[in-house]
C-alpha cells in the first residue's frame, strides 16, 4: 500500500518515460473529469511527487474533447473521458472507437452522497476528534501523510467524517487496489446468482490448448491469489503491473499471456493480473460488452448498495480494470464496507449471500499467516512463533480492502464498524495500526448482531 518500490527510473529509461506519460495522462484525466479537481492540483499533488521524471511531464487538457495528453521527452500518452465509465488510456485503439463503444451505456441516477447515512455519536466524542486530527496532522517542514478523507461508521450510522482541503464528501477518490475487493463483490454477485462457479476453470481463451497447464486455474484460485501465474507486482517501469496498466489496451489478455510460476493452488502471490482475468470473466458472463458489464455493476451492486458515485473505469476492450480503477466518494467506499458488515444486505435487499461474506473473510489456504482472504486483506499473523498480528492493536477479525497510497476500507465485525481512510501517502508515514486503534477506542463496541 506504500510506494517504497515506486521508483519510476528503475527498469530502463524507455520504460520509465512510457510509464510516466501513461500514468500522468490517466491520473490527470480521471482527476479532472471523474473527481472534479483542477488539473494543476492533480499534477502537483498526485503526479509530480511520484518521481523526478514525473516532475518533467507536460499535461494538456481539452475539456471539450474530454482528453488529457501527457508528453515527456518526445513520448506522449492520451487518456479519454467518457461519462459513466471515466477515463481510459487510448492504447491499441482510437478516440473515435472508444466513443463508439460507449454509445450504448445505460443512464444513471443521482442523489446526495450522504442521503442514506443517519448521524450517530461516539462513546467518547473528544477522543474520536483527537484521533481524526492525528490522521490528518502533518510535519510542517516535510508533509508526507496526505490523508484526503476519513470516515467512521458504526451500526450504519455516520460517527465522523473529515476531508483535506480540495476534497469533500462529493469527491470520488481512486481506490487503487482497494478496487480488487469491489471486483470481488461483483464476482460474488455472479456466484450468488448461480451464474459463476467458484470451483470451475476460468476458461481463458488464451489457454485453450489441451496441454496448457493454466487451463486448470479456477475462479477460486484467482480470488485467493493462488493461481500460480507469474506476475511482477511492484509499481516500477517494466514490471507486469505498470506494463499492464499503462502500456496495454487489453489488460486481461496481458495477464493471460504470463506463464505459470507454480502449480495452481499451491503458492500465494499478491498480484493484479488475476483480478483482471476475473474482470473479463465477469464481462463474458453478463453479455460480453462494456455496456452489459457496466449495467450489471450498476444494477446488481452500486445502485442497491447506495454507491451512486462509483465509477469503475475500463480498458480499451471495455473490461473494467478491477485491479485498480474504481473511483467513489469516501462515503460510498464506507457503504461498500457496510454491505459486508451487514452480511451482504443493503436497503433490505440481499446483494451477496451469507456464504460469500464468510468466504471473503476466511483465510486463503496458501496465504502466509492468513493475511489474505477472498480479494480482501486480513489482519493475519506476522510472526508465526509469537503469533503476533500484523496490526497488533486492532481486532483479529478485521478485514479490509487496501490500495496503493494507503487507501483503506476496514471492516470490524466485533465493533460493527467501518473505517475508511483515503489519501496519497507515498511512504510509510500513515500508521494504520495506531490511527485505527485510537478510533476504535473512542467508539462504543456494539452489541448489535444484525445489519445496521
Name the predicted role of every residue range.
Residues 156, 174-199, 222, 278-282, ...:
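Active-site SXXK
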Residues 144-147, 171, 404-405:
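Short, small/polar residue-rich loop motifs at catalytic or cofactor-binding pockets
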Residues 115-155:
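Beta-lactamase-like hydrolase cores
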Residues 193-230, 257-260, 287-324, 328, ...:
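Active-site helix/loop module of the DD-peptidase/beta-lactamase fold
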Residues 4-16, 21, 42, 398-452:
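Structured C-terminal helix/loop/strand segments within mature extracytoplasmic catalytic/sensor domains
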Residues 183-184, 273-283, 324-345, 407-423:
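Active-site-proximal alpha-helical segments within enzyme catalytic domains
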Residues 307-314, 361-418:
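Active-site Gly/Thr loop motif
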Residues 159-172, 235-319, 324:
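Catalytic-site signature segments of enzymes, centered on catalytic residues
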Amino acid at each position: 500500500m506504500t510506494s517504497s518500490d515506486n521508483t519510476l527510473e528503475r527498469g530502463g529509461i524507455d520504460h520509465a518515460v512510457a510509464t510516466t506519460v501513461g500514468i500522468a495522462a490517466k491520473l490527470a484525466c480521471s482527476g479532472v473529469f471523474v473527481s472534479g479537481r483542477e488539473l494543476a492540483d492533480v499534477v502537483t499533488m498526485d503526479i509530480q511527487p511520484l518521481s523526478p521524471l514525473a516532475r518533467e511531464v507536460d499535461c494538456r487538457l481539452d475539456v471539450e474533447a474530454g482528453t488529457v495528453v501527457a508528453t515527456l521527452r518526445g513520448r506522449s500518452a492520451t487518456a479519454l473521458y467518457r461519462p459513466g465509465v471515466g477515463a481510459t488510456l487510448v492504447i491499441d485503439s482510437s478516440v473515435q472507437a472508444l466513443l463508439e463503444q460507449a454509445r450504448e451505456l445505460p443512464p444513471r441516477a443521482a442523489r446526495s452522497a450522504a442521503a442514506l447515512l443517519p448521524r450517530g455519536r461516539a462513546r467518547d466524542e473528544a477522543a474520536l476528534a483527537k484521533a481524526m486530527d492525528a490522521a490528518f496532522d502533518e510535519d510542517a517542514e516535510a508533509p508526507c501523510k496526505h490523508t484526503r478523507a476519513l470516515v467512521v461508521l458504526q451500526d450504519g450510522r455516520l460517527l465522523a467524517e473529515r476531508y483535506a482541503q480540495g476534497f469533500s464528501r462529493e469527491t470520488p477518490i481512486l481506490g487503487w487496489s482497494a478496487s480488487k475487493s469491489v471486483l470481488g463483490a461483483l464476482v460474488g454477485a455472479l456466484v450468488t446468482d448461480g451464474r459463476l462457479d467458484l470451483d470451475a476453470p476460468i476458461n481463458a481463451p488464451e489457454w485453450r490448448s489441451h496441454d496448457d497447464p493454466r487451463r486448470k486455474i479456477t475462479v477460486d484460485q484467482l480470488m485467493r491469489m493462488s493461481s500460480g501465474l507469474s506476475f511482477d507486482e511492484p509499481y516500477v517501469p517494466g514490471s507486469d503491473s505498470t506494463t499492464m496498466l499503462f502500456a496495454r489496451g487489453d489488460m486481461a489478455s496481458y495477464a493471460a499471456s504470463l506463464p505459470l510460476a507454480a502449480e495452481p493452488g499451491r503458492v500465494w502471490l499478491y498480484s493484479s493480473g488475476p483480478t483482471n482475468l476475473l474482470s473479463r470473466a465477469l464481462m463474458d458472463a453478463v453479455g460480453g460488452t462494456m455496456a452489459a458489464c457496466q449495467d450489471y455493476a450498476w444494477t446488481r451492486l452500486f445502485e442497491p448498495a447506495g454507491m451512486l458515485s462509483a465509477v469503475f473505469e475500463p480498458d480499451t476492450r471495455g473490461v473494467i480494470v478491477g485491479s485498480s480503477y474504481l473511483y467513489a466518494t469516501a462515503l460510498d467506499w464506507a457503504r461498500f464496507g457496510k454491505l459486508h458488515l451487514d452480511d451482504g444486505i443493503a436497503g433490505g435487499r440481499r446483494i451477496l449471500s451469507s456464504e460469500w461474506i464468510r468466504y471473503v473473510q476466511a483465510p486463503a489456504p496458501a496465504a502466509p499467516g492468513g493475511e489474505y482472504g477472498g480479494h480482501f486483506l486480513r489482519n493475519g499473523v506476522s510472526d508465526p512463533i509469537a503469533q503476533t498480528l500484523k496490526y497488533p492493536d486492532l481486532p483479529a477479525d478485521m478485514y479490509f480492502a487496501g490500495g496503493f497510497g494507503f487507501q483503506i476500507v476496514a471492516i470490524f465485525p466485533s465493533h460493527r464498524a467501518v473505517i475508511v481512510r483515503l489519501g496519497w501517502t507515498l511512504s510509510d508515514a500513515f500508521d494504520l495500526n495506531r490511527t485505527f486503534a485510537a478510533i476504535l477506542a473512542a467508539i462504543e463496541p456494539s452489541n448489535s448482531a444484525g445489519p445496521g
